[in-house]
Each structure stands twice: as structure tokens, then as C-alpha cells.
Amino acid sequence: MAKKSMKNRELKRQLTVAKFAKKRAELKATIVNLNASPEERFAAVVALQKQPRDASAARLRNRCRLTGRPHGVYRKFGLGRNMLRQAAMRGDVPGLVKASW
């Protein structure tokens, strides 16, 4: 199990990303817009750099919903490999069966 502080930190990052998403998209659009003046583009770059680091979606980490494990997480289920295996063995995941050949 991940520490509570790590889970809370990730939740805080998700909220920060959601809060700044619209403004970041506008600034990025201004930066790549070739019709904008160089001064406007530079101002957009500076404004983007002044935003918090955690406002970037690249800083988010997929974590298991049950344990908070950061590695071995299946996106489709939102579970870590261990929890997914346990859920599959209990029959909690419809259509998922253990392979045998």
C-alpha cells in the first residue's frame, strides 16, 4: 500500500491540473500560433512557465485505485496487477478469465 501522503499528493496534482487546464491550453495555442506577434508568443511562454509545475498533466501518475501502487497499473481497469489478479480470481471482472492452453 502506498502512503496516504503519496495518494493525497497525487489527488492534489489532479485537482491542480484540472484547475489550470483551460488556461494552459490557451497559452499553448498562443505559443504555436504563427499569426501572433513574437512579443505575444514570448509573453505566453513566460506565463506558462510561471504556472505551478503540478499544473502540467505530464506530472500525473497512474495509481491503483485500491492500493495506490504506482507501477504495474492497468489503465483499462485502474487496478494494479496484484489487485487485478485477485479481482479476476474472485470473478469481480466480467469476461476476464485466467488463460489456459
UniProtKB/Swiss-Prot annotation:
PANTHER family in alphabetical order: 30S RIBOSOMAL PROTEIN S14, SMALL RIBOSOMAL SUBUNIT PROTEIN US14M
Lineage: superkingdom: Bacteria
Record-annotated disulphide pairs: none
Pfam families: Ribosomal_S14
GO biological process: translation
Molecular-function GO terms, alphabetical: rRNA binding; structural constituent of ribosome
InterPro entries named in the record: Ribosomal_uS14, Ribosomal_uS14_bac/plastid
Keywords: Ribonucleoprotein, Ribosomal protein, RNA-binding, rRNA-binding
Family per record: Belongs to the universal ribosomal protein uS14 family.
Protein name: Small ribosomal subunit protein uS14
Function of the molecule: Binds 16S rRNA, required for the assembly of 30S particles and may also be responsible for determining the conformation of the 16S rRNA at the A site.
GO cellular component labels: cytoplasm; small ribosomal subunit
Entry annotated with the keyword Metal-binding: no
Subunit note: Part of the 30S ribosomal subunit. Contacts proteins S3 and S10.
